[in-house]
């Protein structure tokens, strides 16, 4: 019997995964996914800056210093947070995504980090992403509103999945 994998849109068997459409979230319509796909290269180009600002922000909090007190911890945060943010803009909410989010949650729990701290840090990342959207969209207010709305939606989905 084939193993079954549940995603947001479908239940797929291992045999048809290669040809099945990539799973996504029902709240992400085609227009939202398109905006996020267009914004992903902006994030990718500036990911090192985004992560550096994130690390500077969280290292000021005693509760977050546990994760940023060693070179190994910083390297891990830099790598994993950067990868995670870029993956969000791919809108791939599949079994791999949920496994990664689960591992991140376990790492937070193991470090004794309460949700209020990492959610607060995520709020700062959201601020940085909105700043990038402002740069990206320029004077096009309608596009900016749509892009920020798409960013908010994908971040909300991610936070709810943790």
Residue ranges and their predicted role:
Residues 45, 49, 53, 76, ...:
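Short, well-structured alpha-helical interface segments that form or flank functional binding sites
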Residues 54-55, 59-89:
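Structured interaction and signal-relay segments at domain junctions
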Residues 37-59:
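TRNA-binding/sensing appendages of the translation machinery
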Residues 2-31, 42, 82-162:
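Long, amphipathic alpha-helical coupling/dimerization segments that relay conformational signals between
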Residues 34-40, 65-70:
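Charged, low-complexity surface segments at secondary-structure and domain boundaries
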